Amino acid sequence: MMPLSRSRLEFIATILQNVLNLGLLTLGLILVVFLGKETVHLADALFVPEQASKYELVEGLVIYFLYFEFIALIVKYFKSGLHFPLRYFVYIGITAIVRLIIVDHKTPMDVLLYPAAILLLVITLWLCNSNRLRRE
């Protein structure tokens, strides 16, 4: 098998990068639609007088922030020269674990492990923002 020339490798990389960009753009548009649906769902839950609706409202708010953070991550990807900053993934992880704490608190061990995971992610965020690991 003949080795590929540098220009062909760059062409393949460009094609794959464009496919990735198109996929992320499509995902961003789908998330915007879901964000709109969640807005309507939150408005419905806000005006329902039942106690269960308050629980749904809080859960919906956290899901709303997850959609919002994923959209912000995709926007940041395109604005920062096709690069995903690590801290955005950490923010999404923290929000997802907070959602788990609110929604799924069946066992006491989970109630202890979820905040420990958040602490680990906050330490990770602190390390990523320190001068030693900061990227220019």
Curated annotation (Swiss-Prot):
It is a multi-pass membrane protein. One of its GO terms (cellular component) is plasma membrane. It is found in: Cell inner membrane. InterPro entries: P_starv_induced_PsiE, P_starv_induced_PsiE-like. Its main location: membrane. The chain crosses the membrane at residues 15-35, 55-75, 83-103, 108-128. The keyword Isomerase does not apply. Pfam families: PsiE (PF06146). Keywords: Cell inner membrane, Cell membrane, Membrane, Transmembrane, Transmembrane helix. Disulfide bonds: none annotated. It comes from the Bacteria. One of its GO terms (biological process) is cellular response to phosphate starvation. NCBIfam families: PRK02833.1-3, PRK02833.1-5. Belongs to the PsiE family. This is Protein PsiE. It comes from Salmonella gallinarum (strain 287/91 / NCTC 13346). The lineage of its organism: Bacteria, Pseudomonadati, Pseudomonadota, Gammaproteobacteria, Enterobacterales.
